[in-house]
């Protein structure tokens, strides 16, 4: 039987809820995968685990939320136990180069951490599924695939999956999300 589950929706620091609530800091140029913001997210997740008396925590993040999830796993080990990363810009410098070329402007994100640089902090055996839509022209599949391959080489139970026909936004409606979350939970509670 499945353990009791609580689902909590979080907004990244500096972003606003529909009610206008916000916390943290977001750079006007979106360069906000900072160490301080990752510490805020990790602190909030720790507080939620305590409040709900949670044994395990599975993160599900899209785009910047996926990068944040990958960073929390590596920079704050033990806060979360598994993750589903959807459309992850998991290798920030080449992703920024790609986005800048698409837009014909911009520069590097000098304040942001790169999830690839924190893979070694993720405890071995942590289950992670990284998924990118095959039609995603924002966070190209290669960024999440590279992260998953390097994480697996370090002992993380990571794998990459392609969501055929989906783009950066529509991957949020990928029909297999529920199944993948259930698989991650089953890995944590065999």
Residue ranges and their predicted role:
Residues 13-17, 64-67, 89-92, 134-138, ...:
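Solvent-exposed loop/turn segments at secondary-structure junctions
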Residues 1-27, 31:
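Active-site machinery of serine-nucleophile hydrolases
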